[in-house]
């Protein structure tokens, strides 16, 4: 629920001030009343999200002097002047100078309320635009959503339209397409940006652990639960909860998550007491949850509860015009991080960028740019076919080509097993069997991670 709009009310007439305050409070405003302009001015700042209503004739600083101070503080802060009959020419001049409105005494209560509501709506739009502008500037520095294709422009516009609402969002896209980037932008561009952004990969935790991680637990809730634990949902209260790979959430946990979305409350393990939570949920899936066949055992009612707004991130192969721009950005960033000169992009490299399928999407492109910056991608990662004159048989050539594809995938994902499996689309056992058959050591590819990159060897 949004907070009631704020009003600073200034009038030295105690009875009139009290009557106006009661009228505004009955209309849903939160009113701070002051007998002097000096006292009110001390509580104002450029970040004040409300409006100012002031009488003109007051001892000390009068309403017009206060208006000039407010104009210097924030020219977009709406001020309504309350005037006597003889002050109307002064009030009209103030309107021309930037005051929002004037109300001549005596006035009906509805006149005051209507003017205040219009002024508050104007202020709300001003503050929202400022918030989005600040967040967009901050995000563009360290969290890019780069692309000039129409589909990316539409995605950016949609993000800006929904970011500052509290609507839950479902983000759909392939592995590495940037779902967490979108979720983080939704948080940073929203009024929740000062709260926590809490992420959880539902596919990375076993069923026995995920409920404790999400909902928390009390001491003695299960074997090993020695002390109280705050869950991810409660930790995200006041901010944003990002649930990645939500399609992997166990069915029993889905039931509890549906309750959280509907009631905005949790029940930690080991207690029957509920706790309210104020969260926005952004869920991500790499399968089409709207397709019953792809959805599997994911609950239909949970899908519809999350599917208030769905953002679809296109794979990189469907927006190839963005690849040179993205690659240049990643290459410059990696070169700066590694303390290297930005290497020139050769014609062969441009051809590779344009023709490669990029199964790992933006993440694969970013990793590739880092390897180019380090000078370890001289062959561009392209699997080399066996020469026709080598005398190798067809099965031998296929074996060699398969080994090259495995090495390329491991290189693209820095040895991360989960990402490599997703890119290749093969089961884990098949993957390890092929590594053993071809004599490939996964650890060799983990070691290619650059400085500052987390060691992927733990991601098994």
Curated annotation (Swiss-Prot):
PTM comment: Phosphorylated by DctB.
Organism the protein comes from: Rhizobium meliloti (strain 1021) (Ensifer meliloti)
PANTHER family given in the database record: C4-DICARBOXYLATE TRANSPORT TRANSCRIPTIONAL REGULATORY PROTEIN DCTD, TRANSCRIPTIONAL REGULATORY PROTEIN
InterPro entries given in the database record: AAA+_ATPase, CheY-like_superfamily, Homeodomain-like_sf, HTH_Fis, P-loop_NTPase, Sig_transdc_resp-reg_receiver, Sigma_54_int, Sigma_54_int_dom_ATP-bd_1
Annotated positions binding ATP: 173-180, 236-245
Region span, Inter-domain linker: 332-345
Domain of life where this protein originates: Bacteria
Protein name: C4-dicarboxylate transport transcriptional regulatory protein DctD
Sigma-54 factor interaction domain: residues covered: 145-374
Transmembrane segments: none
Function: Member of the two-component regulatory system DctB/DctD involved in the transport of C4-dicarboxylates. When activated by DctB acts in conjunction with sigma-54 to activate the transcription of dctA.
